[in-house]
């Protein structure tokens, strides 16, 4: 904890004064344009990867960057999605997986997680991705795990669209969905192209979307 407290003291001493005007503005309101849903993994820092300032991203993080399908008893992820879309009215949602994801590797390798029942239950929300991934050939476990990361991003994009707030925003043409996979070693991002159903380098394809803004559905 000493390093964390020392870091806070350095923030107060050096970083905060440089952004004092920004924090004063943010003290009473926020208006992020993007909901960023990522894994809890310590190696993926959304604000660092996207070079965003405080107030720019509304962030949800959990093991496996999972969005459970909407159900009769919505949980914390569902509530956060609804708030971001209906109250904050974000214009973009990013679901971001990453290389060497422990959760997806555990699924791909069929690891027994009886000693972590809560984790085991949570990862069931990636079952649709697991089924697709198991049906495809893979040369080795690392390639199978990497494919699982990609399939999971696609599956969570589908789950996201079961949420009423997201579905309405899509129909109204005021939100776009993005599926990314961040590579820790290279710092690159592969983005899911909804038109081709392929992942492509984001740097070379900055406009690619899983689901772009649509024309509003006629009443």
From Swiss-Prot:
| Transmembrane intervals | none
| Stored Gene3D superfamilies | Carbonic anhydrase (3.40.1050.10)
Which UniProt keyword terms apply here?
Answer: Lyase, Metal-binding, Zinc
Q: Which domain of life is it from?
A: Bacteria
Query: What cofactor does this one take?
Result: Zn(2+)
PROSITE patterns xrefs? PROK_CO2_ANHYDRASE_1, PROK_CO2_ANHYDRASE_2
Which reaction is this enzyme known to catalyze? hydrogencarbonate + H(+) = CO2 + H2O
Q: Where does Zn(2+) bind?
A: 39, 41, 98, 101
Q: Name one Pfam family in it.
A: Pro_CA
The induction field says: By cyanate.
InterPro entries xrefs: Beta_CA_cladeB, Carbonic_anhydrase, Carbonic_anhydrase_CS, Carbonic_anhydrase_sf
Binding note for cofactor:
Binds 1 zinc ion per subunit.
In the Enzyme Commission scheme, what number(s) does this protein have?
A: 4.2.1.1
GO cellular component terms, alphabetically, are: cytoplasm
Q: Which GO terms describe its molecular function?
A: carbonate dehydratase activity; identical protein binding; zinc ion binding
SUPFAM superfamilies reported in the protein's UniProt record: beta-carbonic anhydrase, cab
One GO BP: cyanate catabolic process
Q: Which family does it belong to?
A: Belongs to the beta-class carbonic anhydrase family.
Q: How does it assemble?
A: Oligomer.
Report the protein's function.
Answer: Reversible hydration of carbon dioxide. Carbon dioxide formed in the bicarbonate-dependent decomposition of cyanate by cyanase (CynS) diffuses out of the cell faster than it would be hydrated to bicarbonate, so the apparent function of this enzyme is to catalyze the hydration of carbon dioxide and thus prevent depletion of cellular bicarbonate.
What is the protein name for this chain? Carbonic anhydrase 1
**UniProt source species:** Escherichia coli (strain K12)
Q: Gene that codes for this?
A: cynT
């Amino acid at each position: 904890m000493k390093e964390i407290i020392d870091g806070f003291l350095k923030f107060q001493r050096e970083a905060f004064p440089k952004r004092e005007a920004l924090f004063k503005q943010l003290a009473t309101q926020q208006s992020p344009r993007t909901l960023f849903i990522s894994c809890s993994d310590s190696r993926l820092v959304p604000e660092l990867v996207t070079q965003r300032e405080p107030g720019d991203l509304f962030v949800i993080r959990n093991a496996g960057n999972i969005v459970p399908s909407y159900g009769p008893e919505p949980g914390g992820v569902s509530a956060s999605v609804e708030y971001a879309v209906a109250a904050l009215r974000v214009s973009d949602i990013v679901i971001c997986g990453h290389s060497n994801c422990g959760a997806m590797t555990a699924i791909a390798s069929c690891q027994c997680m009886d000693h972590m029942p809560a984790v085991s239950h949570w990862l069931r929300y990636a079952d649709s991705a697991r089924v697709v991934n198991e049906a495809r050939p893979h040369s080795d476990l690392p390639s199978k795990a990497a494919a699982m990361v990609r399939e999971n991003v696609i599956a969570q994009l589908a789950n996201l669209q079961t949420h009423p707030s997201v579905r309405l925003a899509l129909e109204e043409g005021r939100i776009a969905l993005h599926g990314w996979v961040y590579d820790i070693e290279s710092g690159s991002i592969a983005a899911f192209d909804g038109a081709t159903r392929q992942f492509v380098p984001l740097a070379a394809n900055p406009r690619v979307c899983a689901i772009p803004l649509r024309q509003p559905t006629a009443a």
